[in-house]
Amino acid sequence: MKNSGILCIISAPSGTGKSTLIHTVIQCDCFVYQTKLSISYTTRIKRPGEIHGKDYYFISKKKFKYMIDKNMFFEYAMIFNHYYGTAKTDIETMLNTGIHIVLNIDWKGAQQIRSKISKNIYTIFILPPSKKELARRLYLRGEDTEKVIVARMGQAMDEISHFKEYDYIIINDNFNIALMHLQSIMLSEQLRIAHQKIRYATLINHLLLPDI
């Protein structure tokens, strides 16, 4: 029997440090399953240091709308006048090959996916330690105007109101501690008996053989 993949959805308000945590955690060699980040498509402009095909697939609105019309997205949403979406083929291929997939999406995308998948899926919401710290991080990024930051703070409150829809919560006050908590959750999910009894079926059957 083949082990199917696991889907991990991680959401957080902008400025919480979610992307840094995700890119760091998937490099961990502690996992028992191959763990990969699903690369989302977006119509927004690349930020400094971002790489096409690593952080996002940066595409035009025309191409994104074409993909919507062709029903190519597993989920998609409009955030601050930019589209973000996850391609169906990307998720289906990785799940069918037994990969532990990490999705960096908002609560709207999480709702869409949970309405379609009920097995082998779990969700994590990352919170800032305070409103003041969240605002400070947004200002330190130096990417947005005062008006946009005010809008992002308002959006953050709306996003945080959906925390009860998630299975786990992590507070990103200290990065290393938050990273440890994220690793622990992901590893625990991989070690569930539903997955391990398939992964180690041969070993378990051998251990249960009567001595001759």
From Swiss-Prot:
SUPFAM superfamilies xrefs: P-loop containing nucleoside triphosphate hydrolases
Pfam families the UniProt entry points to: Guanylate_kin
Residues that bind ATP: A12, P13, S14, G15, T16, G17, K18, S19
Source organism superkingdom: Bacteria
GO CC aspect terms: cytosol
Keyword Transport in annotation: no
Name of the gene this protein is made from: gmk
Catalytic activity annotation: GMP + ATP = GDP + ADP
Gene3D superfamilies the UniProt entry points to: Guanylate Kinase phosphate binding domain, P-loop containing nucleotide triphosphate hydrolases
GO terms of molecular function: ATP binding; guanylate kinase activity
EC id: 2.7.4.8
Domain Guanylate kinase-like: 5-187
Enzyme class: transferase
Lineage: Bacteria, Pseudomonadati, Pseudomonadota, Gammaproteobacteria, Enterobacterales
Compartments, record wording: Cytoplasm
Coarse class of the protein's main subcellular location: cytoplasm
Keywords: ATP-binding, Cytoplasm, Kinase, Nucleotide-binding, Transferase
Protein name: Guanylate kinase
Family the entry assigns: Belongs to the guanylate kinase family.
Role description: Essential for recycling GMP and indirectly, cGMP.
